[in-house]
Structure formats: structure tokens, C-alpha cells
């Protein structure tokens, strides 16, 4: 038994013991995004992409930025050198081998977004791509330079997590921005917040939930998506 098969076996045994309550509850169709570097692969690599695809990922994520000459690459740094990063074109070509998997393009720079659009269209993936990493100060730039839909990156405040009016105010702001929904760290999310976004036709994506002890509670909030480096555990909860 190789290391990956052993990991799958252990996580399934863990789930059977600790997550029976989730299985008994009414199913909720959240997606699981494979964070770049999942399945013990190097982050922002073709190896990571292929591993996620071979594992049947619904959505995979990698970071997108630009070299000084504007070349689009996948790497976490927002300002790589002229020789750093894997070409975005190569990464997209790898995903294009799948006819289903969607891509979360986590942008670290907005320096040359038209190039991202060009490469996404070239690889026939426009209907399967969306941005995260878009904070409010980047929204106008993204809308002006790219046709790819996006989530608003937002840290949920304690008021937004507990007060419906505050959550509604954020929802209205998000609607005016024209975003798909809210992408946020799971630690400050609440059921009230998620429900309020859903009432306003906005999706909620929560990141990055890697500890098994946190997964059941996050899933119980009923987000639309959960991003993780431990996808087998979350997939077994669905």
C-alpha cells in the first residue's frame, strides 16, 4: 500500500468514527476545492494539478501572478522574478485534459489580467474559471480588465457574523459589485452570515479548513464551498 492509499484509508476510518452525525443529517451540496499543494504535492506545480485531477477534484486552486514582463505564472508571490513560476498556459493546458474540473484562480496581482483571459479562452476553460483573492480595492480593476467572474475576498467581522443587518449591508455591497459571492477565512464565519448571503443569492466559500476537528462544524454552516489541503476527509463527509 503506497502512502496516498494509506492516507485515504486512515481518513475514512477517522470519518466513520467521528462524523457519523454529518452522514445522518440532511445532505447539503457543498463543493470541495483542492488547495494547491494538496495530496502532499508541491504547491503551484503541474504535479499538484495532475494529482487533484486524478483524484477526481471538482475544483482545484492555484495562485496566479505575473513576471516583470507580464507573463502569467502560477506562484504564491505577488512579484516573482523573470524566471520564477510555472507558466499559467501550461497549468491551464493540464486542467483542460479534464472536461469537468473547475479552477479557482487565486490572484496575487492584477498587473496583466487581460493575459489571463486570453489564456483561459485559448484553453477552452472560460466557463470553468473564477477568481478569488479579489479584495475590495481590486474590484474595479478586475471588472475593467477581465471578464472572468469572481468572489469578493472579505474578512467576516464579528458584527457581520452576529447581526443580520450588518450581514445584509455587506450582501448589498457585494451585489452592487457584481460578485459571485464571498470568499473568507472560515474562522469568523457563522450560520447567520451564510444564511444571509444565501437569502441574497450570494455564494459563500470558506478557506482553508485542514484540521479534521474543524471540518464538521464548518460544514454545518452550509457554505457552498470549502477549500482544504485534506480533501479526502471532506469528501467522505458529503
PLM features: residue spans?
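Phosphate-group recognition and catalysis centered on beta-loop-alpha active-site segments
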Residues: 1-238
Amino acid at each position: 500500500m503506497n502512502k496516498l492509499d494509506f492516507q485515504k484509508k486512515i481518513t475514512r476510518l477517522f470519518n466513520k468514527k467521528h462524523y457519523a452525525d454529518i452522514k445522518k443529517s440532511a445532505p447539503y451540496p457543498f463543493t470541495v476545492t483542492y488547495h494547491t499543494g494538496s495530496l502532499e504535492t508541491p504547491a503551484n506545480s503541474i504535479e499538484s494539478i495532475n494529482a487533484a485531477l486524478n483524484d477526481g477534484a471538482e475544483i482545484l486552486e492555484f495562485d496566479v501572478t505575473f513576471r516583470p514582463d507580464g507573463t502569467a505564472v502560477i506562484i504564491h508571490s505577488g512579484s516573482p522574478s523573470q524566471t520564477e513560476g510555472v507558466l499559467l498556459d501550461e497549468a491551464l493546458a493540464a486542467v483542460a485534459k479534464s472536461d469537468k474540473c473547475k479552477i479557482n484562480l487565486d490572484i496575487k496581482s492584477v498587473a496583466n489580467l487581460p493575459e489571463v483571459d486570453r489564456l483561459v479562452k485559448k484553453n477552452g476553460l472560460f466557463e470553468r474559471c473564477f477568481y478569488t483573492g479579489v479584495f475590495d480595492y481590486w474590484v474595479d480593476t478586475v471588472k475593467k480588465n477581465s471578464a472572468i467572474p469572481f468572489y469578493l475576498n472579505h474578512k467576516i467581522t464579528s458584527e457581520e457574523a452576529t447581526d443580520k443587518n450588518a450581514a445584509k449591508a455587506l450582501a448589498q455591497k457585494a451585489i452592487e459589485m457584481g460578485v459571485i459571492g464571498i470568499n473568507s477565512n472560515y474562522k469568523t464565519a457563522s450560520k447567520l452570515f451564510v444564511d444571509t448571503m444565501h437569502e441574497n443569492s450570494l455564494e459563500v466559500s470558506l478557506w482553508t479548513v485542514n484540521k479534521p476537528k474543524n471540518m464538521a462544524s464548518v460544514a454545518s454552516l452550509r457554505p457552498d464551498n470549502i477549500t482544504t489541503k485534506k480533501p479526502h476527509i471532506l469528501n467522505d463527509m458529503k
